[in-house]
Amino acid sequence: MRMSKALAAVVAISVSLSAAAMGVDATVESTCSDAAASDKRVHLAMCLSQLGHHRDADAWGLAKAATLVGVDKADLAADDIKELEAGASTAGIKPALAECAKQYRGVGFAFASAHDVINNRAYDVGEKKLDEALSLTQKCNAAFAKIGVPLQQPLAQLTADTIQIAIIAKAITCLVNVNNNPALVAAAAAAAAAKAPQQSQYP
């Protein structure tokens, strides 16, 4: 169902007020809003909260910043896994924890690699690295689902956050990629024009 113009205006105002309350720079606000519009999986509030302090960054800088948030989330998850593995009551889930530990090593590396290639403006490669980070993180969820046990906190929240930041980072990287590729810009403009309602040539 298409959002009415009035409702869309209310949503836009709400986002602006929320961003202002957090002290978010206008570039961060617009980039996160564009990312959320381009990929419905993007959680706008998380994008604003995680990237809002990067006041001087353009979209390219925000894409790189998001990958570093991903590295940090992966490191925190790895530390939490070690603590869970050391617990006396986790014998039944230790194989799943071992699988998560293995996957999160790859997650951190994928985010770090994404940062490096995005910094070199190899956006397509960066998008693939972020897909890899997302896939590896989801394998931790799958390891616990296989034994029918939910992830314990705070690992569950860290995993959800890592998945979300991979989605956010890729969405922003895609925006930068499109904006820096004349052919993609032209294709996007043509697609938007094709979707726009046609005005009659008659009064």
Curated annotation (Swiss-Prot):
Organism of provenance: Oryza sativa subsp. japonica
Protein's UniProt name: Pectinesterase inhibitor 12
Recorded coiled-coil stretches: none
Subcellular location: Secreted, Extracellular space, Apoplast
Function recorded in the entry: Pectin methylesterase (PME) inhibitor that inhibits PME in vitro.
InterPro entries: Invertase/methylesterase_inhib, Pectinesterase_inhib_dom
Induction: Induced by drought stress.
Residues spanning the membrane: none
Signal peptide range: 1-26
Single GO molecular function: pectinesterase inhibitor activity
GO cellular component, one term: plasma membrane
Main location: secreted
